[in-house]
């Protein structure tokens, strides 16, 4: 890794990437969901920083800055190369993943999409988001909410101390709840379908 290398991921993608990047001294930037945001940040930073890899939780991957969108061919090539390298070391790729979990912590992600069809579907989704925004939970599954990130208002808040801060990303209808146990729960309406998505 070089000092000017960077990794870019979306805000709903595993925080394990941030931790690995930090261990290698690489900057890791978080952007809104969608590869257009990754490509835009590459353009903003390319004069001073070198984009290495980026992606989002929906299995999209971008390697290098030549093709600024999801690149399944490059992803398959990288996975094949990783598999071959680990085989030479006498390991399965799965065993390498376990090694990474042991070194950086165990991470598990899950996505739940709720479809709200019909004339009232979109309204129901808007009401759900407004409810979470106006009456955020104090705890989730027994763990205190330590940060509430409202990307529509571009504000973050620690509900326990009252401390507030700005979020330096474009406005987007996304809420994130960061819990004391390290969990992160994100809620956002789908841009293309009558769905609300919850990322755990």
Model-derived segments and spans:
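Phosphate-binding and adjacent anionic-ligand microenvironments
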Residues: 3-188, 195-197
